[in-house]
Amino acid sequence: MKVQPRFIVLVSLLLTAYSALNFYIGWHVAEWSAAVVIGYSPYGFWIPFALLAYGFLLGRIPLPNALKPAGRLLKVAGSVYIFVMEIGLLLFLLADAVRLVLWLTNGVSEAYIVGSGTVVLGLIALLLLVGSRNAWSPVVRSHELSIDKPADGGKTEWTVAVASDIHLGNLVGRKHLRRLVERINAMKPDLILLPGDVIDDSIEPFLRNQMSRTLGRLQAKHGVYAVLGNHEYYGGHIPEYIEEMRKVG
């Protein structure tokens, strides 16, 4: 397949912008580390930081079986870092706004560098913990809908369970899925809908951890129905995914 020059230019621009953002974040963390860490080494910081920042991309490179666990680790760490990068960028920009005001007035002291860096990194850690707890704790929200149409069998009320954007993969695994299945089955739904993005992108962890078997434990009187989402298409294994879902009904 011939790669279009426009595509190469676009990817180059995106990588350049991504690298610039990560250098900005890394520079701040390195500055803070140099002030508080005894024996700080630029190489000891920047090499692990680069692996973390590009982990999501590096983890997608095909590897021999012996190295696949390392690739999965990079991808998981890189996925978490994407969240850290987004929050860190906003917080460091805010800290730099204050820093600019100080620089224009009395100058920036090392105490501010240490203090602001500690606050930013502490907030990132706190938000990461809260976000992880929310992501791995299924929340049930109830909505009542009225439809002016009789249901089959004369039943006037149906309980429909809808779970979208589950993103099963290396980060969201079988343990989370079991909790989700238990919560849904406890509702005793008449119908279960999975409207897309059941898997994150790669089908490999879905197959390796036999997550379809856990999904097969979903119970509803009128069945379980799933459709494809954009992340299923990202992985490029649509036939295998459909076949695996059909095996469990």
Residue ranges and their predicted role:
Residues 1-136:
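Non-catalytic terminal accessory segments
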Residues 114-115, 124-150, 170-175, 236:
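Hydrophobic alpha-helical transmembrane segments in integral membrane proteins
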